[in-house]
């Protein structure tokens, strides 16, 4: 019996503050997988280093060898970047794939790649979007079959069931192109939305029920809401 089945924990280094480093120091023994938020991608497909410096993470990488350390590549929710990569505009996707290989070569100790591409388009683009993730997955596995690939996915309660316009994402189609998937089920309302509940129970249950029906449940990390917003009618939170 696998006593850890269903009890894995994934976190990311998005915050980059003192509290984050304290948590890594004190609680790293409880973490299974970490996305290193140290890479961003441009609309040209170029990947550049930004965010938490890899050099600042080496102490924790060496201290906790049981953790899968993944290089996270993000587009910061820029639709123009997502679209250029998806459509291979001026060879953007081709360059992106070669850049993924480059950063794995630069940091050979990494356990794999974490893809955080957000703010895609509607359902009419789901085939092309899935093809992009297929190409990323095949690129990672062609480089080294042992490298792990995690993908970050928006909260969905059905096909075409995004509250944030992310209907390009079809869980069942993407299941084959990841080793794990982090479902962002922690933000029905967020800093860029209208005021509302962060993650109402009905929405969370809808995501969990749908995701476990169409994806391999053993692959999934489900995001847990542990925050709130100070909504203000005269300013952003």
Give residue ranges: language-model regions.
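Substrate-binding surface in catalytic domains of secreted glycosidases
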Residues: 43-52, 119-237
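A generic secondary-structure signal
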Residues: 59-60, 99-106, 139, 209-214
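Glycan-recognition patch characteristic of GH18 chitinases/ENGases
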Residues: 1-104
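A general structural motif
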Residues: 6, 29-31, 66-68, 110, ...
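Structural recognition of alpha->loop->beta junctions
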Residues: 27-35, 88-117, 166-189
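Short acidic/His/Gly/Ser-rich catalytic and metal-binding motifs that mark active-site loops
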Residues: 77-82, 113, 190-192
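Hydrophobic faces of well-ordered beta-strands that scaffold small-molecule active sites
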Residues: 9-13, 32-36, 69-73, 113-115, ...
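Intrinsically disordered, low-complexity coil segments
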Residues: 65-66, 90-91, 105-110, 140-146
């Amino acid at each position: 019996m696998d006593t850890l089945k269903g009890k894995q924990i994934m976190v990311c280094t998005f915050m980059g503050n003192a509290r984050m480093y304290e948590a890594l120091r004190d609680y790293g023994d409880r973490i299974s997988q970490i996305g290193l938020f140290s890479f961003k991608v441009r609309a040209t497909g170029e990947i550049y280093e930004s965010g938490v410096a890899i050099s600042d993470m080496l102490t924790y990488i060496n201290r906790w060898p049981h953790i899968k350390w993944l290089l996270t590549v993000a587009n910061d929710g820029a639709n123009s970047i997502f679209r250029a990569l998806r459509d291979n505009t001026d060879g953007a996707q081709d360059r992106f794939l070669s850049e993924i290989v480059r950063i794995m070569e630069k940091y050979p100790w990494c356990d794999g790649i974490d893809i955080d591409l957000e703010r895609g388009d509607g359902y009419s683009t789901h085939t092309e979007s899935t093809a992009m993730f297929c190409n990323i997955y095949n690129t990672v596995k062609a480089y080294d079959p042992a490298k792990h690939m995690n993908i970050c996915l928006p909260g969905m309660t059905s096909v075409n069931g995004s509250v944030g316009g992310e209907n390009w994402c079809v869980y069942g189609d993407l299941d084959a192109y990841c080793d794990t998937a982090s479902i962002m089920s922690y933000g029905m309302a967020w800093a860029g939305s209208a005021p509302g509940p962060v993650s109402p129970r009905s929405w969370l249950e809808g995501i969990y029920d749908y995701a476990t029906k169409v994806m391999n449940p053993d692959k999934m990390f489900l995001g847990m809401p542990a925050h709130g917003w100070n909504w203000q009618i005269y300013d952003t939170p």
